[in-house]
Curated annotation (Swiss-Prot):
Lineage: Bacteria, Pseudomonadati, Pseudomonadota, Gammaproteobacteria, Vibrionales
Enzyme class: transferase
Lineage: superkingdom: Bacteria
Protein name: Protein nucleotidyltransferase YdiU
Transmembrane domains' residue ranges: none
Family: Belongs to the SELO family.
Length: 489
């Protein structure tokens, strides 16, 4: 039986005019081999759970496959606030679309496939370390429940790639509901290709926002949906302590899904000024700046949509960003604290918590996980996370008093056990700390991929106890704290 039997393919983007893309044949790597195949996810598309040579040959571009029509998308974007017209898929190719078991179509994108017309000064390759980081983080985010692109698998090779040192080329099979970015609309706006921009908007509505087609102003409704989805994504980032690192408009998905994992980082010590990108000298994309930058990016998108949407409608939609962000962030933080009843004083409780975390530089993830264990542990386990134990004790007393006000639908007081069981499904025990990723990369570069596979499995269930992996909850060693990652990939 064919491995493709029962898998449905299409390629709607390839039906658009030539202004949208260029067809490109993947440039083969030497001795390509599987590093990891995401079998559990693959089965959701009708693909086999285990990797094999047929899958390798087709996805690596070594064998022609009728449903695939590899193409490089053209787009533009604002990078660190400066418009760059010369962007596009410089090392990745959109192969086709594949239908999920729930009926949703997902793009299949091969990253590291070689030169394209948009490679600029690059070589079109992706190195092993950056490919491992993107694979692990996209799957870690999915495990956490944060909107994200996914990864179907990754491969390494014997092809040398020259960066600061000689490395080896790798391939990532990225899967996403769309690869359309803010920068697609910007490209057509700034090149005055307004008919193409209108066509793009029509297709985005048809493919991704069909409900907007019934609206009085479909394009305005589309933009409002993009604003809302972006606000929700940012709320997740801030609640879970994720720093993206390179929030250029060409890295912003129209569906509010975390896109293009480069110099990302999860908070270790709580530091709102955390900068994970080694190249971000001004801190433009620092952790606490992410909501502001998302709104800036949406404003740039709004400007590019001005031929399609009236100014007052664009401004009205932008005005809803902070409202939706605040609503979603509050909802997520309440869940993390086990507080489902709204009380006016909660804002002060939240503020005091963040101030305490910041002043003591306590570990963000461990703090919330310990709060989730107060049904089986003493409050001292939380207090001991802080240098200023007196202040921590005072806050914990306030928090526990607040928990006493929680009641269920029947008006009954919520027990600590019930509260904490829910919190443990919201506050992860495991996250992809940068030092863990680096250890896996170091081993992989020596030919040992066991740690990559171990992390990939562990991070699928970040909320579960998995006691055999307790070592992965350790705080980072000195060398692994607040790691700044290079954009070099």
């Amino acid at each position: 039986m064919s491995v493709w039997e029962g898998v449905n393919f299409t390629h709607r983007f390839s039906e658009l005019p030539s202004a949208f893309f260029t067809y490109v044949t993947p440039q083969l790597l030497d001795n390509t081999r599987w590093v990891v195949w995401n079998g559990e996810f693959a089965q959701q598309f009708g693909l086999p759970a285990a990797e094999n040579e047929e899958l390798l040959n087709v996805f690596a571009g070594q064998k022609e496959f009728a449903p695939f029509a590899p193409l490089a998308m053209k787009y533009a974007g604002h990078q660190f606030g400066v418009y760059n017209p010369d962007l596009g898929d410089g090392r990745g190719l959109l192969l086709a679309e594949m239908q999920h078991q729930d009926g949703t179509w997902f793009d299949i994108h091969l990253k590291g496939a070689g030169l394209t017309p948009y490679s600029r000064m690059g070589d079109g390759r992706a190195v092993l370390r950056s490919t491992i980081r993107e694979y692990l983080c996209s799957e870690a985010m999915a495990g956490l429940g944060i909107p994200t692109t996914r990864a179907l698998g990754m491969m390494d090779s014997d092809t040398p790639v020259y960066r600061e040192k000689t490395e080896y080329g790798a391939l990532l099979i990225r899967v996403a509901e769309t690869h359309i970015r803010f920068g697609h609309f910007e490209h057509f706006f700034y090149t005055n290709q307004l008919a193409e921009q209108k066509l793009l908007a029509d297709k985005v509505i048809e493919w991704h926002f069909p409900e907007c087609s019934e609206a009085e102003k479909p394009y305005a409704a589309m933009f409002e949906s993009i604003v809302e989805k972006t606000a929700e994504m940012i709320a997740y980032w801030q609640a879970y302590g994720f720093a993206h690192g390179v929030m250029n408009t060409d890295n912003m998905s129209i569906l509010g899904q975390t896109f293009d994992y480069g110099p990302f980082g999860f908070l270790d010590d709580y530091d709102p000024n955390y900068i994970c990108n080694h190249s971000d000298y001004q801190g433009r994309y620092a952790f606490e700046q992410q909501p502001r930058i998302a709104l800036w990016n949406l404003s740039a998108l709004a400007h590019s949509l001005s031929p399609l949407v009236q100014r007052e409608d664009l401004e009205a939609a932008l005005g809803k960003f902070e409202v939706r962000l605040s609503q979603k962030f509050s909802e997520l933080m309440r869940a993390k604290l086990g507080l489902h009843t709204k009380v006016d004083e909660d804002g002060r409780l939240f503020e005091a918590m963040f101030e305490l975390l910041n002043q003591n530089k306590a570990d963000y993830t461990r703090f919330f996980r310990e709060l989730s264990n107060l049904d089986v542990k003493s409050p001292q386990a939380v207090i001991d996370l802080f240098i200023d134990r007196e202040a921590a004790s005072a806050w914990v007393d306030l928090y526990l008093a607040r928990c006493e006000l929680e009641v269920d639908e029947c008006g009954e007081r919520v027990s600590a056990q019930t509260r904490c069981e829910k919190m443990r499904r919201t506050n992860p025990k495991y996250i992809l700390r940068n030092y863990l990723a680096q250890i896996a990369i170091d081993k992989a570069e020596e030919g040992d991929f066991s740690e990559v596979n171990r992390l990939a499995e562990l991070l699928k269930r970040p909320y579960d106890e998995q006691p055999e992996f307790d070592d992965y909850t350790k705080l980072p060693p000195e060398w692994g704290k607040k790691m700044e990652i290079s954009c070099s990939s």
